[in-house]
Amino acid sequence: MATSILGEEPRFGTTPLAMLAATCNKIGNTSPLTTLPESSAFAKGGFHPWKRSSSSCNLGSSLSGFAVATGGRGSGGLAGGSGAANSAFCLASTSPTSSAFSSDYGGLFSNSAAAAAAAAGVSPQEAGGQSAFISKVHTTAADGLYPRVGMAHPYESWYKSGFHSTLAAGEVTNGAASSWWDVHSSPGSWLEVQNPAGGLQSSLHSGAPQASLHSQLGTYNPDFSSLTHSAFSSTGLGSSAAAASHLLSTSQHLLAQDGFKPVLPSYSDSSAAVAAAAASAMISGAAAAAAGGSSARSARRYSGRATCDCPNCQEAERLGPAGASLRRKGLHSCHIPGCGKVYGKTSHLKAHLRWHTGERPFVCNWLFCGKRFTRSDELQRHLRTHTGEKRFACPVCNKRFMRSDHLSKHIKTHNGGGGGKKGSDSDTDASNLETPRSESPDLILHDSGVSAARAAAAAAAAAAAAAAAASAGGKEAASGPNDS
């Protein structure tokens, strides 16, 4: 049958490229009989879109009803034809919304329909009339069967069905259907949106759907239209806003399209400027306070001494750089008139001042004792009387004592009353030697006088003992020869 229809001998090869070239050569031919390459291999297993097969769609009944609804030819002319005349390629011959598609492929599908009709026994005139009738069918009815044929953009069906279901396909222009969701070429700022009165006017091209879209989406007016680039430039965020403009322009337009109202409040340039000024003042004040605090702390930390109110320290502060010698000596004197005690550490001076004031902050917590002391070493010495601890041992005889002065007196006995370690009235050990004594000056003088008297008495006794020993030795030497 194919040989009878195609009245041309096979001149091309059987490769797909050769068949494609032959098909392209035949496009635009108005003859009802189209010559296509044919060979034994092509007739057996090749792909031929215009060749009738047993599995081709038979849409006679649907086409008959379709013709009646659109006012075309009678249903008998279409229903009486074979299934090849009603193939799917005849329906999609042309489309009013796609002129390029119609001009390029309209003749191809018309010729193929005429060839199939001739093969089925239908006259070429009737087949041509059928193709002409089908090409004049309005696209809105054909879109129900083949919605993707003749679309100007892949999102056109969603665009028409989502916003206005009554829009015809011919009313939607290519510019209006393909530009409203695109990213703007030059957005002003990352929060710059359309004016409240226009809605989507700047994001839609001029076309028929604008009136209906404005009527539907005009109520969704953005509340942050006054938040422009100047508000952020006053606060020093202009560069970051400009850098983020190309990232957020699409999302904010889609936010307005979907009907979500923004949550950002409106700000004016004056309020933003006031807030920026307040923030800068607060930051500068905090920085100045931090700098002042750090300088004061560093001055106290690296001054080499703690804060002291003794007369020597006050004099050094008054003299300034001239008082460096006083600060270098590190002498802290008691300010009580008539005392004149001088200490090398402020802690010793504070302990001494507690003796003047009578303050006794250290309390013995032994059962039924409750005695109070001026210094902590005094309390420790008192606690050893309760516990019986003897922490001072003699290095010669290993005898132990409770007080350090007792040990000092004992060591003198080993040295024959002279030299050796000089004892102190304090019972502090080597770890607490820096703690000053808190006895009164009278007691200290009394102790020193007693010690001197004892030393003098001991020296006199030693001299007397030596004289007695010398006299006894002389007598023995004088009587020795007489005894013999």
UniProtKB/Swiss-Prot annotation:
Belongs to the Sp1 C2H2-type zinc-finger protein family. It comes from Homo sapiens (Human). A motif (9aaTAD) lies at residues 178-186. The modification Phosphoserine is found at residue 440. CDD domains: SP9_N. Signal peptide: none annotated. It comes from the Eukaryota. This is Transcription factor Sp9. Transmembrane segments: none annotated. One of its GO terms (biological process) is embryonic limb morphogenesis. GO terms for molecular function: DNA-binding transcription factor activity, RNA polymerase II-specific; RNA polymerase II cis-regulatory region sequence-specific DNA binding; sequence-specific double-stranded DNA binding; zinc ion binding. It is found in: Nucleus. InterPro entries: Znf_C2H2_sf, Znf_C2H2_type. The keyword Lyase does not apply. Residues 409-446 are annotated as: Disordered. A zinc finger (C2H2-type) spans 332-356, 362-386, 392-414. Transcription factor which plays a key role in limb development. Positively regulates FGF8 expression in the apical ectodermal ridge (AER) and contributes to limb outgrowth in embryos. GO terms for cellular component: chromatin; nucleus. The 9aaTAD motif is a transactivation domain present in a large number of yeast and animal transcription factors. In SP9, the motif is inactive.
